[in-house]
Amino acid sequence: MKHLVIATRGSKLALWQAEHIKSLIETEHAGKVDVSLKIIKTKGDIILDVPLAKVGGKGLFVKEIEEALLDGSADLAVHSMKDVPMELPEGLFLGCIPEREEPSDTLLSVRYASLDALPHGARVGTSSLRRQSQLLALRPDLDIISLRGNVDTRLRKLMDGEFDAIVMATAGLKRLGLSAPHHEVLAPPRFLPAVGQGALGIEFREDRADLRDMLAFLDHRPTRIRVEAERGFLAGLEGGCQVPIAGHAVMTGDDDFRIEGLVADLKGERVIRRTLEGTGANARNRGLELASQVLADGAAEILDEVYASGAADRQ
């Protein structure tokens, strides 16, 4: 029997995702493959007292995991796609992108039923400049406060009354079966998600032809097209996942898609949104073209100001 090791972060959500892929592999190759998990702490797991955008550097949640792939102590890694840098280390690639969970964000609250129901000056917790910008664009009166930690920690702080509401990825909440007394899905086009949000990426070494064949069943072409278009948009902006950039692609046919991209300033006062259509074969290039459009429309100036403010580091 073949044995595979999955490298993963140790958070409850990361473990759920790794266990999910483990189960799919062992079911598909029943009696032929068994899988174990190797838990690895990343820089992003260790530095919890600084907003993510200020920690800086690429691959906050993946670098140490990729080192395990390169040194052979793990065979594959399961990542949240929104954490995966644009450029992978030499010798590694994203072999599979499984079917995507809902990419939206969700507003959670103990007392208030929706974003519109929040009182003037309500304290809203989020670790994301992208969410901050879009929240302030909709509700400039809100007090946005940095919130770090795993899913349980964030929910506990909400329940303890530190915040009137918090915003988290819908996919993580659904995967862990978590919620709050009140919740509202902040769905596109009203509120755009991070590039790759809700999707998983399976990374392994390029020289592992055995894994290419064994794991091919995990790859979901519509999800790959959507994610490649979104990542093309982010690459064209030379941005990371901690910057106020959002991208969301949807399939409009068997091979056709539409992508909407957004860049905003930190206060949500200037928001640039543009849309393009494309096909699977040119997904990444259409994302790059969309980036060129928003840069020409003023996004370059906005991003320069974000970096100059010190709120986020250039990737």
UniProtKB/Swiss-Prot annotation:
<comment type="subunit">
    <text>Monomer.</text>
</comment>
<keyword id="KW-0808">Transferase</keyword>
<comment type="pathway">
    <text>Porphyrin-containing compound metabolism; protoporphyrin-IX biosynthesis; coproporphyrinogen-III from 5-aminolevulinate: step 2/4.</text>
</comment>
<dbReference type="InterPro" id="IPR022417">
    <property type="entry name" value="Porphobilin_deaminase_N"/>
</dbReference>
<dbReference type="GO" id="GO:0005737">
    <property type="term" value="C:cytoplasm"/>
</dbReference>
<dbReference type="InterPro" id="IPR000860">
    <property type="entry name" value="HemC"/>
</dbReference>
<dbReference type="InterPro" id="IPR022418">
    <property type="entry name" value="Porphobilinogen_deaminase_C"/>
</dbReference>
<dbReference type="GO" id="GO:0004418">
    <property type="term" value="F:hydroxymethylbilane synthase activity"/>
</dbReference>
<dbReference type="Pfam" id="PF01379">
    <property type="entry name" value="Porphobil_deam"/>
</dbReference>
<protein>
    <recommendedName>
        <fullName>Porphobilinogen deaminase</fullName>
        <ecNumber>2.5.1.61</ecNumber>
    </recommendedName>
</protein>
<dbReference type="GO" id="GO:0006782">
    <property type="term" value="P:protoporphyrinogen IX biosynthetic process"/>
</dbReference>
<keyword id="KW-0627">Porphyrin biosynthesis</keyword>
<dbReference type="InterPro" id="IPR022419">
    <property type="entry name" value="Porphobilin_deaminase_cofac_BS"/>
</dbReference>
<comment type="similarity">
    <text>Belongs to the HMBS family.</text>
</comment>
<dbReference type="InterPro" id="IPR036803">
    <property type="entry name" value="Porphobilinogen_deaminase_C_sf"/>
</dbReference>
<feature type="modified residue" description="S-(dipyrrolylmethanemethyl)cysteine">
    <location>
        <position position="241"/>
    </location>
</feature>
<comment type="function">
    <text>Tetrapolymerization of the monopyrrole PBG into the hydroxymethylbilane pre-uroporphyrinogen in several discrete steps.</text>
</comment>
<dbReference type="Pfam" id="PF03900">
    <property type="entry name" value="Porphobil_deamC"/>
</dbReference>
